Amino acid sequence: AGLHAFAGDRSHIEALAHDGFADDPIIRSIEWILSRNETPQIHFNRWSMFDTALAHANQSRAFYEFGVWMGDSFRYLIDHFPQGYGFDTFEGLPEEWHGLPRGSYTSFGEVPNILGAEFVVGEFRDTLPEFFAHERPMAGLINFDADLYSSTITALNHARPVIDSSTV
């Protein structure tokens, strides 16, 4: 229904709204996007989204990723930056989340071996205060991929010193 709406055929979205799904978060999100003066780019995979982000990033700066897991996105993005910093426990989710138990998405403690990467292992609330207590290079791009709001807000708050109007 969403893709039809983006292509100009709103009949499917309107039918869903009429059938009692008007307050569904996905329907509301689609309606919000369609209400914009300019429809945003739609990406059907993360690589396409990353390519768009890279096109806007200052690639002479550092890259930061909060939530590395197996390192696939880090590996893709680091090729475009002189240095990269990754933060993760590598032990999975630090708490239960949407029915997933603590420890889901674990890489079993395995830290990826990626050229140009500096990984900081541990929970954000424990590692970020010390890491950002020292001067760090400004960010060209930051990938916040921590899954949890609590982890992401911690990362956002501590990463402030490396974020400016040029950071993607």
Set out the residue ranges of the language-model regions.
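Long, compositionally biased, helix-prone stretches
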Residues: A1-G2, D126
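Class I SAM-dependent methyltransferase Rossmann-like catalytic core
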Residues: G2-Y64
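S-adenosylmethionine/decaboxylated-SAM
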Residues: L34-R36, D51, H56-V168
